[in-house]
């Protein structure tokens, strides 16, 4: 049997982290079993589904590198197929037309509620004689009246639901459109889905869908219903806990590897291991190892993972993701060092790519003013002599290398008989405009000789003016 999984989001909003984790689990199960992963867009809610949401879902999946083997399929393009099956079911007697008005159904529910009974359709039209063609009606699935639906969930174990608890589900509306639960069944059947990984909020749908599959003579997939993700306060994860959209994490400077690594651990583990490559996840992941307890989202842990990946991944790869943030912050990288070199220089300090981009601006753009606090502290009168001497030594360099720059700074401190800080701190403020940067040798090397000399000259004039004022 070829394992075939699917991710089937509804395009009524962005791809949120809960959906991304479900997609990841489904993708991993397919890859771990040399199977296939299908992307399906469940857009039957015509009022709420939007193309913007479809685009956001596809963008999120692509950014996460969760590639699909089939799709994306769209349910709205398969209405003829769904109606074909419904018509076959009407002929076979596994579905029937229901002519009950909304008013009658509401009255039935009120009466059931008053008696403390479970509110469900009372079967009024089940077995009723056909009425005139064209009379408004819905089509209901003829749910079995006795027995139970039993299935073994990979996460929750054996689940059993008595059929008497289930309704005769509407599978086609009055306007002729098929309903969500029915479309899902036909899609899973037609697409050969063997394993359905989805959120626990779908558990109530599963016995209904299994009964329809049985009525169609279709194979029953295996199911894994994963628990919801909670905020750190124990409440359901929402916008008040911070970002919930996958692409918001991109915008905030996270790498896809960090988010994937974090999401997979929200409900799954492999020993005490915290950090996984995608190859390791494919090797180790098993549906049966998913924990059924809800997991709390910890933003600090995600930030820690992101910092790890910024440092650990190939600088060329990180630079490709950093480029988006440079453009987003309006930084023109065409006149300056290679982004990969900047990543190498700044990765030890940066927790996010957004932060890294902001802190790298001085490599590409000249600044109008020095940071006021840093200038007050380090560009004082005593800095004039060290700045002038290091300026001369740097100007004399024939090779603009890290080693040569370091030697020039060291020689300046030695000749003036001062500590390296007396040279280094004014020089750092001079060339960066602020008080933080990587080592001065690599900072100057990346800024370049001409730009460095220009900035040091500006700092010398600044200190001189300060002395004379």
Curated annotation (Swiss-Prot):
Q: Which domain of life is it from?
A: Bacteria
Claim: Ligase is one of the keywords in the record: yes
> Per UniProt, which keywords does this protein have?
Aminoacyl-tRNA synthetase, ATP-binding, Cytoplasm, Ligase, Nucleotide-binding, Protein biosynthesis
Q: Where on this chain is 'KMSKS' region (motif)?
A: 236-240
Q: Pfam families in the record, alphabetically?
A: Anticodon_2 (PF19269), tRNA-synt_1c (PF00749)
Motif mapping: 'HIGH' region: 9-19
GO MF terms held by the record: ATP binding; glutamate-tRNA ligase activity; tRNA binding; zinc ion binding
Q: Which transformation does this protein catalyse, written as a reaction?
A: tRNA(Glu) + L-glutamate + ATP = L-glutamyl-tRNA(Glu) + AMP + diphosphate
Q: Please tell me whether the keyword Cytoplasm is annotated for this protein.
A: yes
Query: Which cysteine-cysteine pairs are annotated as disulfide bonds in the entry?
Result: none
This entry's Enzyme Commission designation comes to 6.1.1.17
Q: Which GO terms describe its cellular component?
A: cytosol
A biological process term (GO) from this entry: glutamyl-tRNA aminoacylation
Q: Where's it found, cell-wise? A: Cytoplasm
| Positions contributing to ATP binding | 239
Its subunit composition reads: Monomer.
The job of this chain, per UniProt, is described as: Catalyzes the attachment of glutamate to tRNA(Glu) in a two-step reaction: glutamate is first activated by ATP to form Glu-AMP and then transferred to the acceptor end of tRNA(Glu).
State the similarity comment: Belongs to the class-I aminoacyl-tRNA synthetase family. Glutamate--tRNA ligase type 1 subfamily.
Spell out the protein name for this chain.
Answer: Glutamate--tRNA ligase
What are the leading ranks of the lineage? Answer: Bacteria, Pseudomonadati, Pseudomonadota, Gammaproteobacteria, Alteromonadales
